[in-house]
Curated annotation (Swiss-Prot):
Gene responsible for this protein: dphB
The organism of origin for this protein: Methanothermobacter thermautotrophicus (strain ATCC 29096 / DSM 1053 / JCM 10044 / NBRC 100330 / Delta H)
Family per similarity comment: Belongs to the diphthine synthase family.
A biological process from GO: protein histidyl modification to diphthamide
Source taxonomy: Archaea, Methanobacteriati, Methanobacteriota, Methanomada group, Methanobacteria
NCBIfam families: dph5 (TIGR00522)
Enzyme class: transferase
Catalytic activity: 2-[(3S)-amino-3-carboxypropyl]-L-histidyl-[translation elongation factor 2] + 3 S-adenosyl-L-methionine = diphthine-[translation elongation factor 2] + 3 S-adenosyl-L-homocysteine + 3 H(+)
Protein name: Diphthine synthase
Coiled coil: none
Length: 264
């Protein structure tokens, strides 16, 4: 049996009771933190919470050597992952491989930024369009597709959840400020008027913690601010319902003049 168990958003206390009980039944417990890492926790804290030792696997050990699959041929194995298990394609591929090899599987879900961010931003979840990721750029690599995809969402009247690149193995996490700078640079490069310094955006930091940060304003203001420790993400809203607008003012600190022009 292969269990893929979500650890949730922020720390070791986010794992579900169902997940803890499944771990009790497992012969071996593995984890991967290259797709994401719990920023409010550590391996030792996770081990204390679940009462088991955990072997952390690298990308090659999972995607090439298929260690969880090989071990699950004979044993009950748990693979712990940050967030919700099936958001990452890597974990979906493991389930496909396990099914083809006759291994029984069970997925135990947990909280994810995909569902948490719309709620924290006070925006109606069904109004979100395609999820966007801004990658780390360089002098030789500057894709504009994240920017244009946000534009497509805006044209459709859909909010955009914008995830920011991480390189967990390097302890490198894109900040909201870096993401906003990307949007302004892409806007300057394409010169299409989709996004500007006057565009409303929402910054979310440390979702799942006791005190997550939610801050809304025009990009020109936000890009000058410091949002503290990771993880960060962005939301670029389309047209707003009046309740969404009130939330951004009252909870996220947006100037009313900035959001009122967005009310449908």
């Amino acid at each position: 049996m292969l269990y893929i168990i979500g650890l949730g958003l922020y720390d070791e206390n986010d794992i579900s009771i169902k997940g803890l009980r499944a771990i009790e039944d497992c012969d071996e417990v593995y984890a991967e933190f290259y797709t994401a890492m719990l920023q409010g926790s550590s391996l030792s804290a996770i081990e204390r919470r679940i009462g088991r030792s955990v072997k952390v696997l690298g990308r090659g050990e999972i995607e090439e050597e298929r260690i969880p699959i090989e071990r699950a041929l004979e044993l009950d194995v748990a693979l712990l992952v940050a967030g919700d298990p099936l958001v990452a394609t890597t974990h979906t591929e493991l389930l496909i491989d396990a099914h083809r090899r006759g291994i029984e599987t069970r997925v135990i879900h947990s909280s994810s930024i995909i569902s948490a961010a719309p709620g924290l931003a006070g925006l109606q979840a069904y109004k979100f369009g395609r999820i966007i990721t801004i990658p780390f750029t360089s002098d030789n690599y500057f894709p504009t597709s994240p920017y244009t995809n946000i534009g497509e969402n805006l044209k459709a009247g859909s909010h955009s959840l914008v995830l920011l690149d991480i390189e967990a193995h390097r302890n490198r996490y894109m900040t909201a400020t870096e993401g906003l700078r990307y949007l302004l640079k892409a806007s300057e490069k394409l010169d299409d008027g989709t996004i500007s310094g006057e565009t409303l955006a929402v910054v979310i930091a440390r979702a799942g913690s006791e005190k997550p940060l939610v801050r809304a304003d025009k990009i020109a203001t936000l890009v000058e601010e410091d949002f503290g420790d990771p993880l960060h993400c962005l939301v670029v809203p389309a047209g707003l319902h009046f309740i969404e607008a009130d939330y951004l003012v009252e909870i996220a600190g947006a100037p009313r003049a900035v959001v009122e022009r967005m009310i449908l």
